[in-house]
Regions:
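Rossmann-like AdoMet/SAM-dependent catalytic core
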Residues: 3-42, 49, 115, 162-258
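SAM cofactor-binding core of SAM-dependent methyltransferases
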Residues: 22-118, 130
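Short, solvent-exposed loop/turn segments at secondary-structure junctions
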Residues: 41, 54-56, 78-81, 108, ...
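Active-site segment flanking the S-adenosylmethionine/decSAM binding pocket
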Residues: 47-55, 101-174
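A structural signal for short, well-ordered beta-strand segments and their strand-loop junctions
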Residues: 50, 74, 129, 150-154, ...
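A short acidic (Asp/Glu
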Residues: 58-62, 84-85, 138-142, 163-164, ...
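Residue-level detector of short, conserved catalytic/binding motifs and their immediate flanks
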Residues: 62, 70, 149, 210-212
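Short, structured coil segments at secondary-structure junctions
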Residues: 67-68, 146-147, 198
């Protein structure tokens, strides 16, 4: 584990409960994977956009802000999460908070490109991360204004490795956090197909079966990295229990993606 990861993990582990230790360790593994990919793809702008951060302490870009001199935009649509994030991220970043713009806005297909233009991002950024437990697929599909070098996006392992499906687009969709319904997001296969259409290569997933990693095709070719097949890399979300009755019920509402 690198010195930089240890630095941020110390801040995160402060005042943490025992029940959250495993979650935090999985977060640190994900951060290490991000650094590994950046090492091979290279860094050009040190700019990022992250959509969906909860309280900001375990999102994908705070470490880049804290320890590597990056700057960018974090967006959180949930008002409660946003207010917590303002406090947590300031504790983590200190003076480096000046390099972050934090927005409280509910992202939709209609407003996403306007948000990006309004915040004056160049078309090429190093990293885009999407984790909103809902319209992730539809937001990535709608983005036209930027061409990130790397995309990290949440997939729903509940839908399995073979089904290419998403939830139906609803601009007001909010995941039922309390009951943890499996109806949210998109399958890994659906995201793989979308990535191909947008000229991105699926290169891997994290060990928790939550996040998929994509690299822009022109960069993947430069480092001789071939796209992975879903069947070879698919992993289940280890923290979510499976209820076959729930699964069968939710599957009836899914939208197949070709």
């Amino acid at each position: 584990m690198t010195k930089e990861i240890i630095l941020i993990s110390t801040l995160i582990l402060k005042n943490i409960g025992i029940r959250k230790i495993l979650i935090t360790l999985s977060y640190l593994k994900r951060i290490k994977l991000i650094l590994y990919i950046l090492k091979h793809v290279g860094i050009k702008t040190k700019k990022f956009i992250e959509i969906g951060i909860e309280n900001g302490s375990e999102c994908n870009t705070t470490n880049l802000l804290k320890n590597f001199g990056w700057s960018g935009l974090q967006i959180e649509g949930n008002e409660k999460f946003y207010q917590n994030a303002k406090i947590k991220i300031k504790e983590i970043l200190g003076k480096k908070i000046k390099n972050l713009k934090l927005l409280n806005v509910f992202v939709t297909k209609k407003n996403i490109n306007h948000i990006l233009r309004k915040n004056a991002f160049n078309k090429e950024i190093d990293l885009l991360s999407i984790d909103i437990d809902g319209n992730d697929f539809w937001i990535w599909k709608a983005i036209r204004y930027i061409k990130p070098r790397i995309v990290i996006i949440e997939y729903n392992s509940f839908f399995g490795p073979n089904k290419s499906a998403t939830i139906k687009y609803n601009p007001k969709f909010k995941w039922d956090h309390q009951n943890k319904r499996p109806y949210y997001g998109a399958s890994l296969k659906a995201l793989e197909k979308l990535g191909k259409k947008k000229k991105y290569s699926l290169v891997g997933v994290d060990k928790n079966g939550v996040n998929a990693f994509f690299i822009r095709n022109d960069l993947a070719r430069k480092i001789n990295l071939k796209s992975k097949k879903v069947k070879d890399i698919y992993l289940n979300n280890v923290r979510e229990a499976r209820d076959i009755k729930k699964y069968q019920y939710e599957c009836k509402k899914l939208l197949n993606q070709k």
